[in-house]
Amino acid sequence: MWRRINSIGIILDCNSTYAAKLGYAKSEILGRPIFEHVPKESWGEMNDSLQKWFETGEVSNRKITFQKQDGNTFPGLLHAVSLYDEKNNLIGSNTVIFDLTEMTDEKIKILEEFFKNAENRLSEISKDYSKLDENAKSEYDGLKKMFDLLTSTNIRDLKNTL
């Protein structure tokens, strides 16, 4: 699952997997604070995660409980990296969340292949980096940082974090 937030924790964008997993339409998610998808008893962990992000520019392997629209919860593992504008001002983060209840060997194999393909594609794009406009460079930099973080994670170990 993927989402992008601004510097104060408001969701700017998300993928369909994030919306479907939480039981919302995408339009119901955009513009809402991230705390709306976390049960109150997990707000402390989410706040700690935000604090670490503010201090370091990234969060890795942060276990957070997420809450669906129907009230059911699931354990997730959160990874986030900062996004900056062309003047290096913080504008938000790209965040990937793994649903720990879905970490089967088959799912892990799919993720490993996806990460490998993404790394190859980013490597191809990097050859033309100097030709990109500032907005595209910012997008590329954010994606590159995210995939560097994700590929440094041993996703096979995710099964054992439940």
What is the predicted function of each stretch?
Residues 61-65, 70-79, 84, 94:
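PAS/PAC sensory module
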Residues 11-12:
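Conserved hydrophobic beta-strand signature of PAS-family and PAS-like sensory domains
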Residues 89-100:
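PAS-family sensory domains
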Residues 18-29, 87:
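PAS/PAS-like sensory domain cap-loop motif
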Residues 41-72:
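Terminal output helix/cap of sensory domains in signal transduction proteins
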Residues 16, 28-41:
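PAS-family sensory/regulatory domains
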Residues 2-5:
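Core hydrophobic beta-sheet residues of small sensory/regulatory alpha/beta domains
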Residues 98-109:
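PAS-associated C-terminal cap
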